[in-house]
């Protein structure tokens, strides 16, 4: 299967045309318009600093349904201690920078990625979840929200269970808002342990179509910060 070379024109080939590894296209740019178009079509960018921009739509697709988040017995005990505070959209750039820093030398979160997703955040499409301990940022995640779908990009942790706490809180808030799924993109055992599953790409695209039929919860998500914090059940 050939890999398509993008031009300045804002268009993507159909996701079903991706090669067996999931690579669909190469080139283009990371403008907000192109990124949003990609997510709406089940496509995401993933590349290293020394590579051209690569666009992916793997089959199968790893997703997490918010209601299916797994909270282990040990994690429930940890959450009961209430050691962490979780917030939304209070320091997006700090979160994405930490995601990049902890993968230094082996990261797709390039300066261009940071700038592009920060612009998406300013436009109300990209969001961060932050985990705090005694006033210090110790974990978090970021991603893009369109319709009733959340597209997870990366998470980090510098203390035990900090990123898990952020993800659990996100799932609970998204479930309350009727979100259909979190796109985890590519399978990992860690994601599976948290409840993520692989589904066929065609099924993922059907969920995506259904999710995009709803209005996007656009803007800053700080309103979540006024609500009750993470539940342990």
From Swiss-Prot:
Chemical reaction(s) catalysed = N-terminal L-lysyl-[protein] + L-leucyl-tRNA(Leu) = N-terminal L-leucyl-L-lysyl-[protein] + tRNA(Leu) + H(+); N-terminal L-arginyl-[protein] + L-leucyl-tRNA(Leu) = N-terminal L-leucyl-L-arginyl-[protein] + tRNA(Leu) + H(+); L-phenylalanyl-tRNA(Phe) + an N-terminal L-alpha-aminoacyl-[protein] = an N-terminal L-phenylalanyl-L-alpha-aminoacyl-[protein] + tRNA(Phe)
- Annotated localization: Cytoplasm
UniProtKB keywords: Acyltransferase, Cytoplasm, Transferase
What's a Gene Ontology MF term here?
leucyl-tRNA--protein transferase activity
E.C. number(s) listed in UniProt: 2.3.2.6
Q: What class of enzyme is it?
A: transferase
Q: Which Gene Ontology cellular component annotation is one that this UniProt entry carries?
A: cytoplasm
Query: What Gene Ontology biological process does one annotation of this record name?
Result: protein catabolic process
What the protein does?
Answer: Functions in the N-end rule pathway of protein degradation where it conjugates Leu, Phe and, less efficiently, Met from aminoacyl-tRNAs to the N-termini of proteins containing an N-terminal arginine or lysine.
Give the family per the record: Belongs to the L/F-transferase family.
NCBIfam families, per the entry: aat (TIGR00667)
Protein name (database record):
Leucyl/phenylalanyl-tRNA--protein transferase
């Amino acid at each position: 299967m050939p890999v398509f070379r993008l031009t300045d024109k804002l268009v993507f080939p159909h996701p079903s045309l991706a090669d067996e590894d999931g690579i669909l296209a190469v080139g283009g740019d990371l403008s907000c318009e192109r990124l949003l178009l990609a997510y709406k079509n089940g496509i995401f960018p993933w590349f290293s600093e020394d590579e051209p921009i690569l666009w992916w739509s793997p089959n199968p697709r790893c997703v997490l349904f918010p209601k299916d988040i797994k909270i282990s017995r040990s994690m429930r005990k940890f959450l009961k201690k209430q050691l962490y505070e979780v917030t939304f959209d209070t320091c997006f750039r700090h979160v994405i920078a930490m995601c990049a820093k902890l993968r230094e030398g082996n990261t797709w979160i390039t300066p261009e990625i940071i700038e592009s997703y920060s612009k998406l955040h300013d436009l109300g499409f990209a969001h961060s979840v932050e985990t705090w301990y005694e006033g210090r940022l110790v974990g978090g995640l970021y991603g893009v929200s369109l319709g009733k779908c959340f597209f997870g990009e990366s998470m980090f942790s510098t203390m035990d269970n900090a990123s898990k706490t952020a993800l659990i809180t996100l799932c609970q808030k998204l479930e309350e808002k009727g979100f259909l799924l979190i796109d985890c993109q590519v399978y990992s055992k860690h994601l599976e342990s948290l409840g993520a599953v692989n589904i066929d790409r065609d099924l993922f695209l059907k969920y995506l179509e259904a999710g995009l039929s709803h209005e996007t919860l656009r803007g800053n998500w700080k309103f979540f910060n006024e609500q009750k914090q993470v539940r342990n059940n």
